[in-house]
A protein has these predicted regions:
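Small-residue-enriched hydrophobic alpha-helices in membranes
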Residues: 2-124, 140-231
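Primarily EF-hand calcium-binding motifs
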Residues: 127-129
Length: 231
C-alpha cells in the first residue's frame, strides 16, 4: 500500500539516488529524468522545471506538503484582502509561510474528491503538468520507465508513477481531484511549479486547468506570484 506522506515527501524533499548525468534523449520536461536527483527530491529529475527543483530545496526541514499549502494559503490571503499580487522577493526576505494546522490548506489532513489523499492528488497533478508539452512515443516511454526503475521508490510507488505517466493527458480528470476551492488552488500551484510555461502548450494547459478548477477571478495571479517567489 502506498504511503501518501512518504511518496509526497520523496517527490518533493526526499533523498533520491539515481545513476545518471548524461542526457537520456527524452523530450521536454520528462527528458530530465536521466540527469540525476536535484533539489533533494525525486520530482527534480522527473520534471524539467527549475522552480520545482528550488521548491524541493526550500521544502527540506519543513516538508513539501507544509510549504505547498503555505504558499497557496498566502496567495489566498492576499487575494481575499484584495492586495495586489506581490512580486518575488529575495530569498532572505521571503519567509516560508505555513498553513494553520487542520486548515483547508493542510494537505496532510485533507481528502481529495472521492476520498483519496490530497497529497496523492497533488503528485498526480504535477506528473500530468509535466506531460503538457510532450508527445512520448513507445521507445521513449520504455526508456523513461527504465529510468524510473532505478529511482529510490518501492514497487507500488514505481507502478503508480509509471501508470500516471502512461495515462493520456486529461486536464478534466486532474481538475476533478479538487474537493474544495482551497485544494483547487493547491493543485494549480503545484502544476505551475512542475513546469516552466515557456511553451504555448504549457501555458494553454495551465489556463485550461484554472478554468476547469473554477479558480476565483484574480486568484491565479496571486498563485503565480507565489510560484515566482520560489527562488
Amino acid at each position: 500500500m502506498i504511503d501518501p506522506k512518504k511518496l509526497f515527501e520523496d517527490f518533493l524533499g526526499g533523498g533520491a539516488k539515481q545513476p545518471g548525468g548524461k542526457a537520456s534523449g527524452l523530450p521536454g520536461n520528462l527528458g530530465t529524468l536521466a540527469t540525476g536527483a536535484v533539489g533533494g527530491g525525486l520530482i527534480g529529475p522527473l520534471l524539467g522545471s527549475k522552480k520545482v527543483r528550488k521548491f524541493g530545496g526550500k521544502a527540506l526541514g519543513y516538508g513539501g506538503a507544509a510549504v505547498l499549502g503555505g504558499l497557496a494559503y498566502k496567495a489566498w490571503q492576499d487575494w481575499s484582502a484584495k492586495r495586489a499580487p506581490a512580486p518575488a522577493q529575495p530569498p532572505a526576505q521571503q519567509p516560508i509561510p505555513l498553513p494553520p494546522p487542520r486548515s483547508p490548506f493542510d494537505l496532510e489532513t485533507q481528502s481529495a474528491a472521492g476520498g483519496g489523499d490530497a497529497r496523492i492528488a497533488v503528485v498526480r497533478a504535477m506528473i500530468a503538468a509535466a506531460k503538457a508539452d510532450d508527445h512520448i512515443d513507445a521507445a521513449e516511454q520504455r526508456a523513461l520507465f527504465d529510468r524510473i526503475g532505478q529511482l529510490d521508490l518501492d514497487t507500488e510507488e514505481k507502478a503508480f508513477v509509471m501508470d500516471e505517466l502512461a495515462k493520456p493527458l486529461d486536464v478534466a480528470a486532474i481538475a476533478a481531484l479538487a474537493a474544495t476551492p482551497e485544494q483547487a488552488a493547491e493543485i494549480w500551484l503545484a502544476s505551475r511549479l512542475a513546469i516552466d510555461p515557456d511553451d504555448p502548450r504549457e501555458k494553454a494547459y495551465l489556463d485550461d486547468l484554472a478554468a476547469r478548477l473554477k479558480l476565483p477571478e484574480g486568484l491565479t495571479a496571486h498563485l503565480e506570484a507565489q510560484a515566482a517567489a520560489v527562488v
